[in-house]
A protein has these predicted regions:
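Residue(s) in the substrate-gating loop at a strand-loop-helix junction
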Residues: 56
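C-terminal substrate-recognition "lid" of short-chain dehydrogenase/reductases
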Residues: 36, 48, 131-157
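Substrate-binding pocket helix/loop in short-chain dehydrogenase/reductase
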Residues: 9-13, 20-22, 123
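Alpha-helical segment proximal to the catalytic Tyr-Lys
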Residues: 41, 85-86, 151
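Active-site helix of classical SDR
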Residues: 36, 72, 80
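A glycine/serine/threonine-rich, flexible loop-to-helix segment
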Residues: 89, 101-127
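Short, small/polar-rich loop/turn modules that mediate ligand/substrate recognition or access, typified
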Residues: 88, 93, 153-155
């Protein structure tokens, strides 16, 4: 998500306006609610299915400036886990991925454009494996969670 499109995304809670709060919550959480509601209704008719939502490491670990973003992504994790518990007996698995900084995304491109200091700091001091994730890494995780190899996994973040 490009910060230039969502300049209100990373602000302290006291600086988040009601309008900014609504934009972030509607984009990151309410949209997931509506998608899952209708996906689950269809999957319940089918008797099986798999949903993988996309949250963020920011939903697991809060940080200064995550006034609206962090709670919105934590909400995605919570609604995913609720749906997993409510639908496990119906043959439906619901999981959520929580990627961290990812090469090739708008946010990382913004950091690179700003001199790459943020990206290098993250890689060298925050990310245990010292390697940025890629969009392929994320896609591979989603494919696995949707596959029969993950038939016993539900409610995981």
């Amino acid at each position: 998500m490009n910060q230039n499109l969502y300049p209100h995304l990373f602000q302290p809670l006291t600086e988040v306006t009601e309008s900014d709060w609504q934009k972030v919550i509607n984009t990151n959480l309410t949209g997931v609610f509506y998608c899952m509601k209708y996906e689950l209704l269809q999957m319940q008719k089918q008797g099986r299915g798999a949903i993988v939502n996309n949250a963020s490491i920011g939903g697991l670990r809060m940080a200064p400036g995550f006034g609206a973003y962090g709670p919105s992504k934590a909400g995605v994790i919570a609604i995913t886990q609720t749906a997993a518990l409510e639908n496990a007996d119906k043959g439906i698995r619901v999981n959520v991925i929580c990627p961290g900084p990812t090469e090739g995304t708008g946010l990382m491109q913004d950091s690179i454009d700003a001199g790459a200091q943020d990206a290098e700091f993250l890689k060298n001091h925050i990310i245990p494996m010292k390697k940025m994730g890629t969009t392929k890494d994320i896609a591979d995780a989603v494919v696995f969670l949707c596959s029969d190899m993950a038939e016993h996994i539900t409610g995981m973040a």
